[in-house]
From Swiss-Prot:
Belongs to the peptidase M48B family. GO terms for molecular function: metalloendopeptidase activity; zinc ion binding. The active site is at residue 145. InterPro entries: HtpX_protease, Pept_M48_protease_HtpX, Peptidase_M48. Its cofactor is Zn(2+). Keywords: Cell inner membrane, Cell membrane, Hydrolase, Membrane, Metal-binding, Metalloprotease, Protease, Transmembrane, Transmembrane helix, Zinc. Its EC number is 3.4.24.-. The keyword Ribonucleoprotein does not apply. This is Protease HtpX homolog. Zn(2+) binds at residues 144, 148, 224. GO terms for cellular component: plasma membrane. The chain crosses the membrane at residues 4-24, 39-59, 159-179, 199-219. It comes from the Bacteria. It comes from Variovorax paradoxus (strain S110).
Length: 290
């Protein structure tokens, strides 16, 4: 199972590209021309941080279609496809959101939802899910994904990622400037950032980026509990979602691209970077829910 959600990696790549462009345009030299300009740096960090997260959100749906080789169900060609579309429509109406696009992808049991807006989203299920679960269990999984959309989880995770990106960009450059100043103490001939600044910033971007990913993953796990409860509410009972989770716990875990893993029904097994709580914790939370 891949350990870090696709959204985080897509976001990191976008931020990295923005950082390279900013360096080529001389932003780093501007920020350190007369000492470190913290106000300008904060503005730069906000643009970089939220810019990367928002771009990642906006491209999440086309990226999901491309990376999963999704078969879109525009006009159902079989009773199963008609049932899937009908189930998504039923839950979307119940949740008060626009009808999502619906797709099927090849793979082990899994499903995901994505999209930048509640009324322009996507719900997809795998062939493995359809083959290994009862219709009631698949219905519960679809309800879970629709709940993600209705709860605005993609936007919420984007805002959290944006805050963490801003923290990483700002702090890495403050520390990088301090390291560079220490290494070049007594050298009055050089101006602008030196090699110490660039090396420190790159290393800290990576290290702090992983620390930020842990925080983002924690928030993602909390959203999973809400989506499970949302599925139970949409179905009017919690047993189908509990049955679906129990069955998922006994099946091979289907991998999703990192960009949509956070909005899937199952996620990575790593503790700190896991985007989903352990199956047994999710079942217990549903059992204890009123």
């Amino acid at each position: 199972m891949k350990r870090i959600l696709l959204f985080v990696l897509t976001n990191v790549m976008v931020v990295a590209v923005l950082g390279i462009v900013a360096s080529l345009l001389g932003v780093n030299r501007f920020l350190t021309a007369n000492g470190l300009n913290l106000t300008a740096l904060l503005g730069f960090a906000l643009v970089m941080g939220f810019g990367g997260a928002i771009i990642s959100l906006l491209i999440s749906k086309p990226m999901a279609k491309w990376t999963t080789k999704l078969h879109m169900i525009d006009n159902p060609q079989s009773p199963d496809e008609a049932w899937i579309v009908g189930t998504v429509r039923k839950f979307a109406d119940k949740a008060g959101i626009g009808m999502p696009e619906v797709g099927i992808f090849e793979g082990e049991p899994n499903a995901f939802a994505t999209g930048a807006f509640k009324n322009s989203s996507l719900v997809a299920v795998s062939t493995g899910l359809l083959q290994n679960m009862t219709r009631e269990e698949v219905e519960a999984v679809i309800g879970h994904e629709v709940a993600h959309i209705a709860n605005g989880d993609m936007v919420t995770m984007t805002l959290i990622q944006g805050v963490m990106n801003t923290f990483v960009v700002f702090l890495s450059r403050v520390i990088g400037y301090a390291v560079d100043s220490f290494l070049r103490r007594g050298d009055d001939r050089s101006s602008g950032p030196g090699i110490g600044y660039y090396v420190s910033t790159i290393v800290l971007d990576i290290v702090l980026g992983f620390a930020a990913a842990i925080v983002v993953a924690w928030f993602s796990r909390q959203r999973e509990f809400r989506a499970d409860a949302g599925s139970a509410a949409l179905m009017g009972q919690k047993q189908p979602m509990m049955n679906a989770l129990a069955r998922l716990g006994g099946l091979p875990a289907g991998e999703l691209p990192k960009a949509v893993e956070a909005m899937g029904i199952t996620g990575s097994i790593g503790k700190l970077f896991a985007t989903h709580p352990p199956i047994e914790e999710r079942i217990a939370a549903l059992q204890n829910a009123r």
